[in-house]
From Swiss-Prot:
Localization (cell): Cytoplasm, Cell cortex
InterPro entries in the record: Chaperone_Ric-8_A/B, Gua_nucleotide_exch_fac_Ric8
Pfam family, one: Ric8
Domain of life: Eukaryota
UniProt keyword Nucleotide-binding, yes or no: no
Family designation: Belongs to the synembryn family.
Protein name: Chaperone ric-8
Gene Ontology molecular function, alphabetical: G-protein alpha-subunit binding; guanyl-nucleotide exchange factor activity
Annotated function: Chaperone that specifically binds and folds some, but not all, nascent G alpha proteins prior to G protein heterotrimer formation, promoting their stability and activity. Also acts as a guanine nucleotide exchange factor (GEF) for G alpha proteins by stimulating exchange of bound GDP for free GTP. Able to facilitate synaptic transmission in the nervous system probably by activating G(q)-alpha (egl-30). Also able to activate the G(s)-alpha in synaptic signaling network.
Single GO cellular component term: kinetochore microtubule
One BP annotation, GO: regulation of feeding behavior
Length: 567
């Protein structure tokens, strides 16, 4: 570790009867030497002593910034952090960060910023700091207020003096760190999430930073603006992602506001994939209603109320006006861009190995499928558009390869369905929705092998052999596909390979019997180990274990009596 080791002897020497100037001089050098350190090699006793000494001095105006920086650096190391932090130190950091409202605090912008950065680290790594933060709901209310109070017009007229007195550069950075703190606070405690989800001011306060980006010309949007907007939408996701049904904070007014801001961000063309991703994630949260009047309306064709004299048969449902697919296309394009990166990473390693980075990208694409699926459920126009974009009518050339081998959005989605992840489920559900929940169409496009898990989970295996509806093929097949579809393997979704002869050609009957018995023995071994169990499709359409192998024969056809030797 660079610089002086913070042993008990060193700590006592620095603080014992030392002037503020001497303490500042020592820790200025120590902080500089350890600016890039992540390990500090301190014992529990050394951390306890340092925490007590810093706690006693940190409220000194001359030392606050430098000692906060020291705590921030040491808090990079999760191990042993609880020994450093005591209740008084935690409360002082909250006070210096302006979060616990106390008259006369914060005292300086520099100390405020250091306290914010310190709080980001300690909130993330320390249960003790989180406990001190969450025990007072005023802390959360204060942060939420700050999420919108630093917008230029509000800051200039704020009734908080220290906010009014900041210059724009300082205010921009302080505002960003309050969003960082809000993101961590909303990620760590469900009770805190519920508190914010129940408030009518939450949506407007959180998304204020995103709206500021939209109000600026693209050339005027600074990188810090984008970082702040990104944190804001991640916080929105944290607050609402665990709830279902009606949430007080998402009333009609706030739903309209959230959908408008998120739509505009997604469609804005902002050259920042993280911001677009966070907006799509926020749009996907279950309790946020899909407000089609915002998400799919065409601003060039406003809805005109129809006269009351028009009959019900002549009336056009308002949803029939919501045919603007700009948002739908933007989400599809962002999804495809994400999956191109993910599939490239997955294919860059051997099939039996894992690409952690590729799997992470796949996991992050789950909300894209969720948002699209919800749009498609609410709007037949969105569903049709997605079906045309993702599952265009099949042609003969497309079934020469397996679905996952295609360099297309469909191929990449099927590749995702091959992974053992939760994204596999939402990707399958999205495809099933745009297949109009048709089992036969789903199998045709992705193969039974890829769709079996989804069909089994939803009890749909019993529909596999049902007759097709005319609509299953009328808009999903071409003439050249019809010419080859009888040669398509329904399991793989691709054509059978050319016949290269049977593997048993040239074998004697004794050899064939020997190979058959080897297969039987191998299957018996797997069954004895519990790795394989005989199963059948139950009345609910799901796979169930059979109690006896004879169950597998109950629906077998009777033997042809014409070949019987009996009279």
């Amino acid at each position: 570790m660079p610089g002086d080791q913070l042993t008990e002897e060193t700590i006592q020497r620095v603080f014992l009867n030392a002037t503020s100037a001497k303490i500042e001089e020592f820790f200025s050098k120590w902080n500089f030497s350890n600016a890039n350190s992540t390990k500090f090699g301190m014992s529990e006793a050394e951390r306890n002593l340092l925490g007590d000494e810093i706690s006693a001095k940190i409220d000194n105006d001359d030392l606050a910034s430098i000692l906060l920086e020291t705590v921030r650096l040491i808090s990079r190391e999760r191990q042993g952090l609880e020994s450093l932090l005591n209740e008084n130190l935690c409360d002082t950091i909250l006070k210096l960060a302006g979060i616990t409202p106390v008259v006369g605090y914060p005292r300086s912008v520099h100390a405020l910023m250091e306290a914010q950065k310190c709080l980001v680290n300690t909130m993330f790594h320390s249960a003790k700091m989180r406990e001190r933060f969450y025990m007072n709901l005023v802390n959360g209310d204060q942060i939420q207020r700050f999420l919108s109070e630093f917008e230029d017009s509000r800051r200039e007229n704020s009734n908080i003096q220290w906010i009014r007195e900041m210059n724009p550069t300082q205010a921009a950075e302080v505002w960003y760190f309050y969003h960082r703190i809000a993101f961590i606070a909303t990620a760590m405690d469900k009770g805190f999430q519920r508190h914010w989800a129940d408030q009518s001011t939450t949506v407007s306060n959180i998304l204020c930073a995103a709206e500021v980006c939209l109000q600026k010309a693209s050339d005027d949007v600074a990188n810090l603006d984008l970082l702040r907007a990104n944190e804001a939408m991640k916080t929105f996701f944290n607050v609402f992602c665990h709830f279902h049904g009606d949430v007080p904070g998402l009333d009609e007014k706030n739903t309209h506001l959230a959908c408008r801001i998120l739509r505009d961000v997604i469609c804005s063309g902002i050259p920042n994939d993280d911001v677009i991703q966070s907006a799509i994630h926020a749009l996907s949260v279950p309790p946020l209603p899909m407000d089609l009047s915002v998400l799919l309306s065409d601003p060039n064709f406003p809805i005109v109320p129809l006269p009351e004299t028009i009959s019900e048969e002549e009336r056009v449902h308002p949803r029939d006006y919501y045919v603007n697919m700009t948002l739908t296309e933007a989400i599809l394009a962002a999804l495809d861009k994400q999956l191109i990166k993910a599939v490239d990473l997955l294919n860059s390693v051997p099939f039996n190995q894992v690409s952690p980075e590729g799997n992470t990208l796949v996991d992050l694409s789950g909300p894209y499928f969720q948002a699209l699926a919800r749009l498609c459920v609410e709007s037949k126009y969105a569903r049709r558009y997605c079906r045309i974009r993702v599952l265009p009518p099949l042609v003969a050339d497309e079934v020469k390869k397996r679905p996952e081998e295609h360099d297309s959005l469909r191929g990449r989605i099927v590749r995702v369905m091959m992974l053992p992840s939760t994204t596999k489920e939402v990707a399958s559900e999205f495809l099933f929705i745009i297949c109009k929940r048709s089992v036969s169409r789903m199998i045709k496009y992705v193969g039974f092998g890829h769709s079996a898990g989804h069909l089994a989970n939803f009890g749909l295996l019993g529909q596999i052999n049902q007759p097709k509806h005319a609509s299953d093929s009328e808009d999903s097949e071409t003439e050249d596909y019809n010419a080859v579809k009888d040669n398509v393997n329904p399991v793989t979704g691709a054509m059978y390979p050319p016949d290269h002869g049977s593997a048993m050609d040239g074998m004697s009957d004794a050899q064939k019997e020997f190979e058959a018995m080897k297969l039987v023995d191998a299957m018996n071994k797997l069954m004895d180990q519990g790795l394989v169990k005989p199963g059948t499709i139950g009345d609910d359409g799901k796979v169930r274990e059979v109690s006896h192998v004879l169950e597998l024969l109950k629906d077998a056809p009777e033997p042809d009596t014409m070949d019987s030797d009996s009279d």
